[in-house]
């Protein structure tokens, strides 16, 4: 554990946002919580498909530090991780930014069972687990326009992801879309969806890690006006006819 934690803290020094060092202080307690999270992830991954990455150092860099980079872009207030899967980025953001209330939403109960164990083992406070499909949750008053920030990582192409997530963001709030280096193409295909959903791309940020050959992008999308009540549509319609 000690060697992994040292590696985490050293690699965190090499995390860069737009080429500049990302200010990512990680306390000893937070590092231990991330290690415990990783152990649970690997244990549960033996019986269910949570991650294709099984090397602890790959999990450190490609899951944990990638997820953590969005913490420098968070507004104050509540966070909803839509399609959280194994908890990326939501659990990592919660560990490193404990002051934020966090909702972890997923359509599969077995993933939420894993996340329940993680939250219990790490004694994470102010975390709500929600078993819902995003397109259904976005039409329910308890979730619609309720969050200061939504986040999502590698769930769907951006035009579809916008329809899933923007309805749950408060007017004036933001959506952080974690994407790969092909984001610019997705943004070009999303202009119609952005207009219909009442939002604009506020900024785009490149995430890199010294010594690693991957590059990820986070788009910060601002919700400027309430979403029309017809959105989100049913899943079949969203997939057949993306905005």
Model regions and ranges:
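Class I SAM-dependent transferase core
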Residues: 1-76, 80, 110-113, 117-127
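Short loop/edge segments at beta-strand edges and connector loops
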Residues: 54, 131-133, 205
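Conserved SAM/SAH cofactor-binding pocket of Class I
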Residues: 65-154, 162
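Helix-to-beta-strand junctions that scaffold the AdoMet/dcAdoMet cofactor pocket
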Residues: 97, 169-171
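Short alpha-helix immediately C-terminal to the canonical SAM-binding loop
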Residues: 111-113, 183, 187
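Short "lid" loop at the C-terminus of a central beta-strand within the Rossmann-like core
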Residues: 135, 157, 180-184, 209
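Conserved beta-strand signature within the Rossmann-like core of class I S-adenosyl-L-methionine
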Residues: 172-182
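SAM/dcSAM-binding transferase cores
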Residues: 188-243
